[in-house]
Amino acid sequence: MTGTGRTVTRVDLCEAVYQKVGLSRTESSAFVELVLKEITDCLEKGETVKLSSFGSFLVRQKGQRIGRNPKTGTEVPISPRRVMVFKPSAILKQRINANGTASSMSSSANAAAGDKSESASGT
């Protein structure tokens, strides 16, 4: 399940569980489905799902607001709704930046941020 630009599907997750855990393919599929269903059920109830060293899935309530139709420019009411948000953990962010193509950009951005914080603190 490594590589860049690839989409990992349920089938891929089931296969990884099958290969790494040693469950049968049927059991692996049932396991993955059970985990995804539990996450979905919690989010439907408005609960936050926090997975240590991975991140948090949370539901936010967005209020009604006025938007614009980009073609006509007319105002359009946007109904209140709930949206799901994923907030990655600091550990996951570090792993992505260490292993991804954005690592060089992140390092230079972090270095620049470090320079600013050092000059602000007087060190």
Swiss-Prot record:
PROSITE patterns: HISTONE_LIKE. GO terms for cellular component: cytosol. It comes from Rhodopseudomonas palustris (strain HaA2). This is Integration host factor subunit alpha. SMART domains: BHL. InterPro entries: Hist_DNA-bd, Histone-like_DNA-bd_CS, IHF-like_DNA-bd_dom_sf, IHF_alpha. Keywords: DNA recombination, DNA-binding, Transcription, Transcription regulation, Translation regulation. Residues 97-123 are annotated as: Disordered.
